[in-house]
């Protein structure tokens, strides 16, 4: 009898995505969350802990995905990872691999002093060497003005030591022009991503890359796979473009036509044979009939404003549309205790597609 009671009460959230910060240093054209460097919403650590404790008390968490925005801009990201791992939760972090450069004021002062010393030396020994003067000035200015940085080996080694199970990078463009256009960034942050990717692989973390085929980048999949092979990254996931947030605004510019999708699938088949790692094919390549939707059944997504969604694909759906399918949208700040799911089961047809289809038919 006791066993049956426990079966009714203990319900595990198998897949919990927690968006802990809205801010991101990129300005991606396809971002479903409309994140950028000016956003301010953040989940405080105490709130994060309260939510995790709630789900642990009601049955547990199979896998926790920490995302944003850019989670490594959160001041307590390491505490969050440490806390989830202390509870035995499989923990994954989704990152752009680009963070703010932390240049202490005393170090900036030192760089300025070194610059002035070098210029005095030039004035003393090579006063007519304008080329050398310009090189020295531009070099030190690059040190002083740099905004972006990569995840260091020390940081990533620490993440491995505290038990982070996987780190997932967003890599969307091989060519500089493609990366710049899609990610809304320049060369410095692009290099930071590649450095972060290489550093994560070199310290032995489990590394995955997410690639979303879109009009500007789908033909670059072969080159990206070569970069991953060089960096010793063994896994890439091919994901569907979701027209949400800025992705919705730029849908016509980004979403593949059926002809382009077919061409992309042929490219994947071609390069899959030579790629030494694993190419995970998401809903896009599985086909709708093969994908089993577990949104709101085993899976939940918590936005940085506290709204609890069945999964990230619901960000563009209104509360009224969700209510027609008896989907409630509780908030961790006001009614966390109302967050309840069956904890098991899947749907043959994705729930979000059912709602979108109804919207389009009216």
PLM regions and their residue ranges:
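Flexible mid-to-C-terminal extensions adjoining Fe-S/redox cofactors in radical SAM and related proteins
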Residues: 5-11, 34, 307-308, 312-362
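Residue-level signal for mature regions of secreted extracellular proteins and peptides
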Residues: 17, 21-24, 286, 304, ...
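Radical SAM enzyme [4Fe-4S]-AdoMet core and its adjacent flexible, acidic
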Residues: 7, 11, 90, 112-146, ...
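Short, intrinsically disordered, charge-biased short linear motifs at domain edges
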Residues: 12-19, 276-281, 334-341
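Alpha-helix N-cap/loop-to-helix initiation residues
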Residues: 73, 100-101, 214-218, 328
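Short cysteine clusters
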Residues: 24, 28-31, 293, 311, ...
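Conserved alpha-helical substructure of the radical SAM core
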Residues: 2-161, 165
